[in-house]
């Protein structure tokens, strides 16, 4: 399937979880049943979805801080899902270069949101750095993600 398509699947799943608020594990398992997914695809998707879910308070705090004049509840659920993935990758996935995380998030926003979403996502993610990690997060925790 490839990393781009896997990221897109993860974003759709996060969006679905944000909208439906039903059994998370059941929805993840259903999404991972897709026969076109490789073992690597499944691992990436599950890792992103679980990681974003676990770090949502941190990710949302960063969005609130960086999105000047915007509140989380005013963002579309698509934009929120895209931003959470982008920030999660930037902060917790050292195997994914910063520029790739930003570019992929921008492409998802352009594809699934409104015409201004790509620029909004790009501008916000450009402001994110490892310095945004909460103080209690150790370097070892970041490296193990």
Curated annotation (Swiss-Prot):
GO terms for cellular component: cytosol. It holds the Pfam family NusB. Keywords: RNA-binding, Transcription, Transcription antitermination, Transcription regulation. GO terms for molecular function: RNA binding. GO terms for biological process: DNA-templated transcription termination; transcription antitermination. HAMAP family: NusB (MF_00073). Involved in transcription antitermination. Required for transcription of ribosomal RNA (rRNA) genes. Binds specifically to the boxA antiterminator sequence of the ribosomal RNA (rrn) operons. This is Transcription antitermination protein NusB. The gene is nusB.
